[in-house]
């Protein structure tokens, strides 16, 4: 039996939940500037599948890589780490 490779997971903040069963998650990373060496924050957004429409804007969520679900959706919600205030 062939084992599947571990899927990527990311933790980010929900910035939009206006689509049905879809959330937009902003992921913040820190990278070192190639020339100056300063640590710079980079933010990128990805769309994730939220089957029960349970996320609200501001929630901290964990998403996992999955098969393509639509043109731009390749991630799905694993859990809500922290609810928004």
UniProtKB/Swiss-Prot annotation:
GO annotation, biological process:
translation
Name the family the entry cites: Belongs to the universal ribosomal protein uS17 family.
Q: Which Pfam families match?
A: Ribosomal_S17
Q: Which domain of life is it from?
A: Bacteria
Gene (UniProt): rpsQ
Q: What is the name attached to this protein's record?
A: Small ribosomal subunit protein uS17
Q: What does this protein do?
A: One of the primary rRNA binding proteins, it binds specifically to the 5'-end of 16S ribosomal RNA.
Gene Ontology cellular component annotations, sorted alphabetically:
cytosolic small ribosomal subunit
Q: Which UniProt keywords apply?
A: Ribonucleoprotein, Ribosomal protein, RNA-binding, rRNA-binding
SUPFAM superfamilies (alphabetical): Nucleic acid-binding proteins
InterPro entries linked: NA-bd_OB-fold (IPR012340), Ribosomal_uS17 (IPR000266), Ribosomal_uS17_bact/chlr (IPR019984), Ribosomal_uS17_CS (IPR019979)
Q: Name one GO molecular function term.
A: rRNA binding
Self-association state and partner proteins as the record states = Part of the 30S ribosomal subunit.
Q: Which taxonomic lineage does the organism of this UniProt entry have?
A: Bacteria, Bacillati, Bacillota, Clostridia, Eubacteriales
Q: Which HAMAP family does this UniProt record tie to the protein?
A: Ribosomal_uS17_B (MF_01345_B)
